[in-house]
């Protein structure tokens, strides 16, 4: 019995130190995100690119990689000016027409993260990412912790 307790104590100590080392150089990745790439001046012409949003604490870069592992953008933490989290809410008209009028009382919610930054030339730029509802809170918390910037929150009800 004592051997079992000693073994468990050693496993706990080793896992504690191993977790501490992983968090120092950790890359936080969030799947099921969509980068809304603007192709023109009109916001309606944005093409969604599905991929993974990542916060790399070693290189201090926010990056988005599409499904084919091609980087769509990478932003240095120092270049970030502000981060905005938005949650929008819209009625479900189609479901109300097709299924039941009671769907008018429920709303679909979408989550967006907008990062405003300056590029190498010093001009202001921004990127907008549509987040998955399952990990939107984790993305906001990670963005705040990794970059050191306060994330502004704007939520529609």
Label every PLM stretch briefly.
Residues 54, 74-76, 128-130:
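Generic structural detector for well-ordered beta-strands
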Residues 1-3:
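N-terminal secretory signal peptides that target proteins for export/translocation
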Residues 58-89:
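Mid-length scaffold segments of soluble, non-membrane domains
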Residues 42-43, 66-68, 117-121:
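Short acidic, glycine-rich loop/turn motifs
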Residues 21-28, 79-157:
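Acidic, Ser/Thr- and proline-rich intrinsically disordered linker/docking segments
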Residues 19-59:
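Anionic N-terminal interaction surfaces
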Residues 34-36, 60-64, 113-117:
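Short polybasic amphipathic segments
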Residues 6-15:
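Bacterial N-terminal signal peptides
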């Amino acid at each position: 019995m004592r051997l079992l307790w000693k073994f468990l104590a050693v496993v706990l100590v080793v896992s504690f130190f191993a977790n501490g080392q992983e968090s120092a150089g950790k890359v936080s990745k969030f799947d099921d995100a969509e980068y809304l790439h603007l192709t023109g001046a009109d916001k309606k012409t944005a093409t969604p690119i599905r991929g993974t949003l990542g916060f790399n604490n070693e290189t201090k870069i926010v990056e988005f990689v599409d499904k084919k592992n091609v980087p769509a953008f990478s932003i240095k933490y120092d270049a970030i000016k502000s981060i905005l989290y938005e949650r929008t809410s819209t009625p479900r008209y189609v479901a109300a027409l097709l299924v039941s009028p009671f769907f008018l009382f429920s709303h679909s919610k979408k989550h967006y993260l907008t990062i405003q930054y300056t590029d190498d030339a010093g001009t202001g730029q921004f990127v907008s990412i549509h987040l998955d509802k399952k990990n939107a809170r984790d993305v906001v918390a990670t963005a705040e912790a990794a970059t050191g910037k306060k994330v502004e929150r704007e939520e529609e009800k």
